[in-house]
Amino acid sequence: LIKKAEIFPIEFIVRNIATGSLTKRLGIPEGTVLEKPLLEYCFKKDELDDPLISKEHIFTFDWANEEEINIIDKMTLRINDLLLGLFRGIGIKLVDFKIEYGKVWNKDIEKKEIVLADEISPDTCRLWDVKTEKKLDKDRFRKDLGNIIQGYQEVARRLGIMPEETNISE
C-alpha cells in the first residue's frame, strides 16, 4: 500500500553500537555497545550534509511539534526493538539505522496520522555478523570491503527471502 505522505524534513537515527560519525564526533571507540539506544535527529538537506540537530531546532523551525516528536520517538524505539530481535535471531547485529516519517490523511479518524515513510534495508541500516563482525551493509561499499551485493544477499538468505542459489550477478 502506497500513500502520498507529507514528509518531515528530519532523519531519525538509532544507534545501538558506536560507529561512523558518532565515533568521529565524540571520539568513542568503534564497536562500543551503547547502554541504551541513542536517538539522533538530522535535518534532511543534502547540500548541508544532513546536519545533526536537536529537538529545540525541530520545534523552533516548526519542522514538527512536541507531540509529533514524542510519537515518532516511541515508534522509532519500538522499531529498533523489533529489528534487534529479528536480526539477533539470524546472527546479525543491528548497529544503527536511519528512517523517515511522514503524515497521511486517515479518513476513518478524520485527521493526519504519522507513518513510517521509508524503507528498512541494508541501505539504511548498519548490519554486522555477530561472530565475525563482517559488514553486511552499505559500509562494504563505503569502506571498499568487497562486493556490496554479497552482503545484501547474505542478509536476504538469513532472513529466508532469497534462495541459497541465485542468478543475480556481481
Enumerate the language-model features and the residues they cover.
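Residue-level signal for pocket-adjacent positions within structured domains
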Residues: 12, 29, 33, 48, ...
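Active-site loop/lid in soluble adenylation, ligation, and acyl-transfer enzymes
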Residues: 1-43, 159, 168
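Intrinsically disordered, low-complexity acidic/polar segments
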Residues: 23-24, 106-108, 125-126
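Conserved metal-phosphate-binding beta-hairpin within the catalytic cores
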Residues: 14, 94-118
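A long amphipathic alpha-helix within ATP-dependent nucleotide-binding catalytic cores
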Residues: 63-95
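Residues forming anionic-ligand binding surfaces in small-molecule and nucleic-acid pockets
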Residues: 35-66
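C-terminal helix-cap and adjacent tail motif
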Residues: 120-170
